[in-house]
Amino acid sequence: KYRILISFGNNEKGKSLLRLANGLIKKQKNTSSITAMHLSLSDEVNTFNIEDKEKNSFHQIIEESQLLKQDITTVFKATMDIETEIADVANHGDYDLLLIGLGKSIFEGTILGKVIGLTTRIINPDRLIDKFTGKEGLFENSPFDERTRQIISRTKMPIGILIDKELQQVSRVFIPIFSSEDSFLIDYAQKLIYNNNSEIVLLDVNGYLNTNFVMKSAIDSLEQKYPNNIGLIADKIVRKEFLDQQDLMLISIGSWKQLVDSRSTWLSSVPSVLILKH
């Protein structure tokens, strides 16, 4: 069975993560499952309000699951330490993929928020992202906040981090390939094509798609099986018009760091982004 665990804070993000998970498995419902987990800090929950809190937390995601005709299992927990709890549940629960959202608030007033087009607010120079990456510089440390970084470092399984720009569907997906390490992304492309009939465009940033045997053969077999669902571009310049048509960018964690460090101008036009670590 292919088992996905979604951990969400707010309802909108939970719905986006569910749409994404559904796109990865919807034709394989007998051999897959989705668990949606909401964690609350213990001091916000007491025995009197726990049921109400649980109902409110899942109301919208359950409605969304009915629209998608997707069964889900829900898990609600009160905990003192949300990051540790997410990693523990993921590591001990026999899951194949953990999906979490990256809060928009993290980007407010940061340079990265501006770079990826999530905030237009003027930046306060004192705050210059220094909590975001430690003091050493713009992105050397990690293009993630502390919470996400803790979850990534503690989780011993594949993890996807969604930067959610109101993701509605995953019909058009764009995958930049930066290095031979990115070959695992082809597995996700295949899942989306098979389960969701997604159209996938691969961007060959450094020419690996032709020179790397593993990647080339994986893509060749996908092209033979699904000629209408896969396209390649070798253009270094990604146009805004192209990005505007995409629902999601799928990228590995290493390539995300490279992309952010390169400050590519097109970053501000990216759609929702799923950053994958395997």
Over which residues does each language-model region extend?
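Non-transmembrane accessory domains of multi-pass membrane transporters/channels
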Residues: K1-F58, K69, D182-F184, I193-N197
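Intrinsically disordered or low-complexity boundary/linker segments at protein termini
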Residues: K1-G14, L102-L209, D220-H278
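Well-ordered alpha-helical segments embedded in enzymatic catalytic cores
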Residues: L20, Q60, E85, R147, ...
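Short loop/turn motifs at secondary-structure junctions
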Residues: N30, A90, D94-Y95, E199, ...
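Soluble catalytic regions of membrane-associated enzymes that act on cell-envelope
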Residues: I34-D43, T47-K104, G113-K114
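Short, small-residue-enriched loops and turns at beta-alpha junctions
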Residues: D43, Y208-N212
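Amphipathic alpha-helical segments in well-structured domains
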Residues: E51-I61, F144-T148, M215-I219
